[in-house]
């Protein structure tokens, strides 16, 4: 009888562990031409301490020195040694990079999908506890308004969908980064959600918005610019654009066991009351003056985050 109880207990523990869940925080953040210079590190440290994300999908790294600086002096500050970086492709003036919690993920591969003005970076990660493979497409699309720039953005999304339509419902993936999209009417934005020839590969946006993002009714989703004055090469003009995105595969949007938490999508520091204002204009109802100043001085973008259950 006692032996049978031990066997039953073992099976219950094994069953429970096989269905254990892990909540992962994913953040996309444009770092504004970040390099080996440490002048802005103090500001980024405050932002990162507040976020404490498991994965950072970043844009505008100027060089490999910038990757090392962000990894060693900001993410792994005080010799924490929690994060690793993916292989860095130094191909343009500014490039994308990925940083991840080595205790939660193993990097399987890094590759690029050719694009204009820069490639899409694809990272394949394995979630250690569940062994599920997670695909991240890190993108920094062509900036500026105008039909020619819209066409270049749309062409790059076509290249992305050519890849993702080869996937199926067993693939978990997101597209994140600085999309530089001004409106839901843009061809690039619409292409994310069109049905493909295979029936797979489209994306989902948790944000419910229609038309131009430069509108006070969408103030709470704006990510650029947290500044009204121009300095350090960044954009000014106050918060009035949604340029930074995280989009989700059907498997994450409608998943039962692996999915993202819909009410977790957030723009750090944006309380919805700073349309065309600097993020550190007080009052700010969601962050302190110190953190608002750090967000203001670190970059001309605000970080976007979401939680995913594995």
Regions flagged by a language model, labelled:
Residues 4-14:
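Sec-dependent N-terminal signal peptides
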């Amino acid at each position: 009888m006692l032996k049978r109880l031990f066997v039953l207990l073992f099976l219950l523990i094994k069953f429970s562990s096989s269905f254990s869940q892990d909540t992962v925080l994913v953040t996309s953040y444009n770092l504004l031409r970040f390099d080996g210079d440490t002048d802005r590190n103090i500001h980024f440290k405050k932002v990162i301490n507040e976020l404490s994300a498991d994965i950072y999908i970043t844009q505008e790294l100027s060089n490999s020195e910038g990757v090392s600086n962000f990894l060693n002096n900001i993410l792994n500050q005080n010799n924490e040694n929690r994060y690793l970086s993916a292989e860095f492709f130094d191909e343009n003036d500014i490039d994308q990079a990925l940083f991840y919690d080595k205790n939660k993920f193993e990097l399987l591969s890094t590759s690029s999908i050719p694009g204009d003005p820069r490639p899409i970076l694809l990272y394949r990660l394995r979630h250690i506890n569940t062994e599920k493979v997670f695909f991240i497409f890190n993108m920094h699309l062509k900036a500026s308004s105008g039909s020619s720039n819209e066409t270049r953005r749309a062409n790059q999304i076509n290249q992305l969908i050519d890849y993702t339509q080869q996937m199926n419902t067993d693939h978990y993936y997101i597209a994140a980064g600085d999309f530089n999209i001004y409106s839901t009417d843009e061809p690039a934005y619409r292409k994310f959600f069109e049905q493909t020839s295979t029936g797979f590969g489209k994306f989902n946006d948790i944000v419910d918005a229609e038309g131009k993002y430069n509108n006070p009714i969408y103030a709470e989703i704006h990510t650029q610019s947290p500044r009204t004055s121009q300095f350090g090469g960044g954009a000014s003009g106050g918060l009035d654009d949604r340029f930074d995105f995280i989009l989700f595969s059907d498997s994450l949007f409608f998943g039962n066991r692996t999915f993202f938490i819909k009410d977790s999508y957030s723009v750090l520091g944006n309380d919805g009351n700073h349309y065309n204002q600097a993020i550190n204009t007080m009052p700010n109802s969601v962050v302190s003056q110190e953190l608002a100043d750090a967000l203001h001085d670190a970059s001309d973008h605000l970080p976007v985050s979401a939680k995913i259950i594995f």
